[in-house]
Amino acid sequence: MATWECFRVATDHAQYLSIFDMVKIAKDVGGQDHGFRFIQLPYNMYLDQALTVKNQGDSNQYTILEAAIHLGIGVFASVPLMQAKLLAPNVLPEFGQMSKPSHRAMQFVRSTPGIIAPLVGQKSQAHVQENLEVLGTPVLSETEFSDLIKKLSS
């Protein structure tokens, strides 16, 4: 299920959807082996609602990433580079040993608990090569990621 707004907005928003309701519909239609296993949503250092907005569950106790983990739904992140807006100088904070903004943007997304992988539209072989370079760096540990979130929010 590819989305833009529905899992990132408040529950009273016209486009809001509950992932729990979506799984229930999938089970009603397809049974226990329904095949609804993945969602795609925008996520990056600035479109961070998937990580920060608790809008899922009966009491809004889960973010979409927490709910997806709970339900066994994999999450792919679209716009990890925010259509190259995150690549401009001085937009992203420095962290780790990564000098390139594209690497920092990708590392943030791929280190986020609950995200399977960032999805990047690449227009040239050079972009593919640059984006593959980040795979040589291990994802951040939970502690490192938590520390980065604290740094970003301070």
Where are the model-predicted features located?
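Beta/alpha (TIM)-barrel catalytic core signal, keyed to glycine-rich beta->alpha loops juxtaposed to Asp/Glu
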Residues: 1-154
